[in-house]
């Protein structure tokens, strides 16, 4: 892979803040931090476009005592067999469970799955986290 050097003009205060943050995060140089930001920018753009293949997790915290929430979660997961790769279930306490659903597919479809799962009655909190599949990232 060929590396290209280019210059960027930014306000001094912005660069100082950027340098402070990348040092806190343990980056060895600005180049690697900028490459990570560029990759993230590309992944988010592809996600918004909706037609690119992405991977991700849908994390949900729910009360399993809530009427039908477990059945509805399982039914919805079976509706998306092609996109749902796996799920992990953790008992948080006697009432609350954490479910992490690992997904892969077209961004629009993954967003649809997350919207349906996270809107179920009994789901207290949840979040969709998207990333690329790695195929198009350098």
Swiss-Prot record:
One of the protein's GO biological processes: regulation of DNA-templated transcription
CDD domains: RHH_NikR_HicB-like
InterPro entries: Acetolactate_synth/TF_NikR_C, ACT-like_dom_sf, Arc_rbn_hlx_hlx, CopG, CopG/NikR_regulator, Ni_resp_reg_NikR, Ribbon_hlx_hlx, TF_NikR_Ni-bd_C
Gene Ontology MF annotations: DNA binding; DNA-binding transcription factor activity; nickel cation binding
Keyword annotations of the record: DNA-binding, Metal-binding, Nickel, Transcription, Transcription regulation
Cofactor annotation comment: Binds 1 nickel ion per subunit.
Highest taxon in the source lineage: Archaea
Presence of the UniProt keyword Lipoprotein in the record: no
Chain sites annotated for binding Ni(2+): 78, 89, 91, 97
A Pfam entry, by short name: RHH_1
Cofactors demanded by this protein: Ni(2+)
Presence of the UniProt keyword Calcium in the record: no
HAMAP family reported for this sequence: NikR
NCBIfam families linked: PRK00630.1, PRK01002.1, PRK02967.1, PRK04460.1
PANTHER family the UniProt entry points to: NICKEL-RESPONSIVE REGULATOR
Known function: Transcriptional regulator.
Family: Belongs to the transcriptional regulatory CopG/NikR family.
Name used for this protein in its record: Putative nickel-responsive regulator
Organism, as annotated: Thermococcus kodakarensis (strain ATCC BAA-918 / JCM 12380 / KOD1)
